[in-house]
Structure formats: structure tokens, C-alpha cells
Amino acid sequence: MIALRLKKVLPNIIHHNQTGYVEDRYIGETIRSIFDVMEFTDSKNIPGILIFIDFKKAFDSLEWHYLFSCLEAFNFGPNFINWVKMFYTNIQSCVINNGMASDYFTLERGVRQGDPLSPYLFILAVESLAISIRQNVDIKGIKIGNHEAKLLQ
């Protein structure tokens, strides 16, 4: 239920160039845009650097305090934030290997694999980083007409 509510508001919060996990957006557009930028810079002999970032173990590495601060920054209400906090407080897990379960251990970061809420929480956290990149005047994009391609997600 919470995932469905979050899914509905994401298109209003997440920048249009973030195509993953946002309804009515297609990640193929981002791939096409990357090729278009590369072709443009090659044809105009424009020097530049294209950086591709792949978050290693992305869902496992998201710090909860950062996630909660992102929810606050995007003006989610206290009730919604408290629901999310409830999902990520005092979580324990174990590892099953060859049918044998390990002792339980406390989790301290990450969003749950397979949980429908997880991709939405993750892209909210990534959007916060993306906003910082877009607003940083020292990070330049490639100017194509009146548009600057600075960040493609």
C-alpha cells in the first residue's frame, strides 16, 4: 500500500531524466540519449568525459539515516516517514547456506531485496544526489542547442 502511494507521487518528485522505476518512463530513452550525446560530441569534435556510475550492491549500501533525511527533504509527512522508519528499525536477518541458517544479525543499512517499496526509496535517495550534481556549477554538461546534458539517469 505504501509502495503504491509512493509510486503515484514519484513522477512529480523525480527529475524527468531519471527513467528507472518511474511509471510511464522508459530506461531505453536514457540509453538512446547517451548515444546521442556521444555522437554529437564526436561529430563536433568536442572534448569531454562521460562517467558511468554503477552503484555496487546498491540496495545493500543505502544508509538509513540518509534515506530518512531524503524523505524529509522531499517534504514527506511525519506519518509516512514513521511508517518507513518502522520498516527499517531493529531488523534482523540470517544467511541460509546449504540448508543451514546462520545466527541472526542486526542490519544497519540497505533496503530490502524484493520489497516493492525498495526501488522507490532507492531512487529518492539517488535523486537527492542528482540534485546536488545538477546544482553544482563546477560540474559542466555538454551543451546541445539550448539544452545542457549534465546528468542522464
Q: How would you label these PLM feature ranges?
A:
Residues 1-153:
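Nucleotidyl polymerases of mobile genetic elements and RNA viruses
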